[in-house]
């Protein structure tokens, strides 16, 4: 599974490791992706998201309901 935040769409970046001699070696910069469950009081259920630390701060600021509308997650049929 790819390391992409479901809220901010952050993903890995490619860059260089640099030695003291300034030799370049390719490397990856990975986002801080975590699984987190959020309670949705209107639907009386939990939702599990794979989000970055920045995505968690966005949810704290805006609220889970607004973020769910922005990313387009709908109710489960069941």
From Swiss-Prot:
InterPro entries: Ribosomal_bL28, Ribosomal_bL28/bL31-like_sf, Ribosomal_bL28_bact-type, Ribosomal_bL28_sf. Pfam families: Ribosomal_L28 (PF00830). SUPFAM superfamilies: L28p-like. Keywords: Ribonucleoprotein, Ribosomal protein. GO terms for biological process: translation. One of its GO terms (cellular component) is cytosolic large ribosomal subunit. Coiled coil: none annotated. GO terms for molecular function: structural constituent of ribosome. Belongs to the bacterial ribosomal protein bL28 family. This is Large ribosomal subunit protein bL28. It comes from Buchnera aphidicola subsp. Schizaphis graminum (strain Sg). The lineage of its organism: Bacteria, Pseudomonadati, Pseudomonadota, Gammaproteobacteria, Enterobacterales.
């Amino acid at each position: 599974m790819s390391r992409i935040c479901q809220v901010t769409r952050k993903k890995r970046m490619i860059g260089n490791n640099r030695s003291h001699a300034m030799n370049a070696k390719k490397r990856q910069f990975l986002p801080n992706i975590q699984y987190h469950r959020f309670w949705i009081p209107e639907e009386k259920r939990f939702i599990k998201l794979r989000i970055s630390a920045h995505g968690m701060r966005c949810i704290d600021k805006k609220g889970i309901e607004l973020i769910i509308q922005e990313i387009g997650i709908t109710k489960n049929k069941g």
